[in-house]
From Swiss-Prot:
The gene is thiC. Its EC number is 4.1.99.17. Pathway: Cofactor biosynthesis; thiamine diphosphate biosynthesis. [4Fe-4S] cluster binds at residues 409, 412, 416. It comes from the Bacteria. GO terms for cellular component: cytosol. Belongs to the ThiC family. Substrate binds at residues 69, 98, 127, 163, 185-187, 226-229, 265, 292. Keywords: 4Fe-4S, Iron, Iron-sulfur, Lyase, Metal-binding, S-adenosyl-L-methionine, Thiamine biosynthesis, Zinc. This is Phosphomethylpyrimidine synthase. The keyword Ribonucleoprotein does not apply. HAMAP family: ThiC (MF_00089). One of its GO terms (molecular function) is 4 iron, 4 sulfur cluster binding. It catalyses: 5-amino-1-(5-phospho-beta-D-ribosyl)imidazole + S-adenosyl-L-methionine = 4-amino-2-methyl-5-(phosphooxymethyl)pyrimidine + CO + 5'-deoxyadenosine + formate + L-methionine + 3 H(+).
Amino acid sequence: MKYTTQMDAARKGIITKEMEIVSKKENMDIEILREKMAKGQIVIPANKNHKSLDPEGIGSGLKTKINVNLGISRDCPNVDAELEKVKIAIDMKAEAIMDLSSFGKTEEFRQKLVNMSTAMIGTVPIYDAVGFYDKELKDITEKEFLDVVRKHGEDGVDFVTIHAGLNRDTVKTFKKNTRVTNIVSRGGSLLYAWMELNNKENPFYEYYDELLEICAAYDMTISLGDALRPGSIADGTDASQIAELMVLGELTKRAWEKNVQVIIEGPGHMKLNEIEANVILEKKLCHGAPFYVLGPLVTDIAPGYDHITSAIGGAIAASHGVDFLCYVTPAEHLRLPTLEDMKEGIIASKIAAHAGDLAKGVQGADEWDLKMSKARQKLDWEEMFSLSIDDEKARRYRKESSPEHEDSCTMCGKMCSMRNMNRIMEGKDINILRSED
């Protein structure tokens, strides 16, 4: 039996090779996986033209996944540096990479990225439109916007962020409700500008059915972008954000009618106590579609440390049911991330994702922690290093500050609780003052 997309296959009772791979990775019964995909609760972004892809699932009951942003900008157009970031992201087991290139002809970089990446690839096609056509934003036509999306599909992109929820109605809500930081979504701000300059409806909303046909043709997952996400604590969970979310819920149903897989994008900046409510709202208004959040950042005061503000919010969000975290680096709000910034961002996001998985009871999530605890109890340093989320850093710290005795560290020395409890439990003496046992 033939199928067009992963969702179409799931609804027809067909088990695809991508489903088989995800089922084994997640230790989820394949029929449960298929049923959730048929309902839109799980997606497997897998463009038919992405031949090097090692597929991953995103959604209900699965491990929380992370995405790494990279790409070329006008001020930092170094392609080789960005390709090095791709290699690091893959080595560090990020499940997704988004090419957010915003300068020049990005096609060659995007094609290299797809060809070399086992991780799923996402893009924001509107970023590419100005460079692709070599036109000012206001001069790009509705058809040209759609053609850029088609080009990304041809190139093998697995999921595309489309800010289709920013329409004339949500713009009215935005204009009525004063914000501190207006529209902070780059794609959202470009679309808003295009709409205002041309006095027209958002082309991705007006021609949404045509957009869905493009996505279905390549089995591109549509990541419905939140153009009106809050960019400051003051704007969190405001009328504009929720108005757009309601539209995204309607667009989700329309995509599912065409068997197009959907991810919903979310905040952004918000207070800790608002995170759970935002997850509940998304799951309710968007009918259980997987939720993909940028952070959320839980305070605005920490430039240089936003990988921490994001990890705090990300862990809480994941614990309440968020399915996909976009990493944030220490460079957020300051500059294009360096390789080191990127590494720190990936690790912070992976910690947040795993902490969330522990809290929401993802199958097998606690096995990693149990192995680490047992290694600590045995003072098996090599095992601890091998289990560390960043084994290189753990080894380096141990090497830089070596203890007198191997069965301790320089924090506690011979007062190490693990060391002394092991000895007492084995019926041995505890020696703290003497230099030798």
